[in-house]
Amino acid sequence: MRRGFKQYKLLGFLSVCLLLGACAEHQESMANNDPSKYRLAKDVLWASPNGLDLTMDIYTPTTGAATYPVVVMFHGGGWLINDNSIMDQSAAYLATHANYVVCNVNYRLLSDHGNSVNLNEIVNDAFGAVLWVKDNIADYKGDRTRVAVTGDSAGAHLSAMVVNMGDRLSSD
């Protein structure tokens, strides 16, 4: 019985080492995103609820295709902290290595407007960002009929909420 535990312990240790090595390699490759392989439209204003300007950074691949599929990306931070800059490397990676137009979105935080923003407003921001993308992404060579959403942590929650509200998106 004791011997089996040692084998699992060793296997677990080796698995963690392998995973950490893969993560380090992925981080290095993300840090080497070639800026000549995408065009960046920084701080594109997409809404101004209650006077707070909401922006997104739009990364467009430069491979010469007529249009590209689109990924709308929401950052994490517990709806309280951070902005889209924490997703810059991931956005550039998707644009350069997967040929997506990436919309890296800022949304209101719970701490904005003297802590008066609520979670429903943040969810509406996320949904509004996707609606804006569908209406405007052709200006950035994005295909409005091929839009996906993703996010990290709180951003993943917002992505799930957008998907759940999908029946409110137009069918095209």
Which residue stretches match the model-derived regions?
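Bacterial N-terminal signal peptides that target proteins for export
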Residues: 2-12
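N-terminal cap/lid segment of alpha/beta-hydrolase-fold proteins
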Residues: 27-66
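Catalytic nucleophile-loop/oxyanion-hole region of alpha/beta-hydrolase
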Residues: 47, 83-84, 90, 103-144
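Primarily recognizes the serine-hydrolase "nucleophile elbow" in alpha/beta-hydrolase
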Residues: 128-172
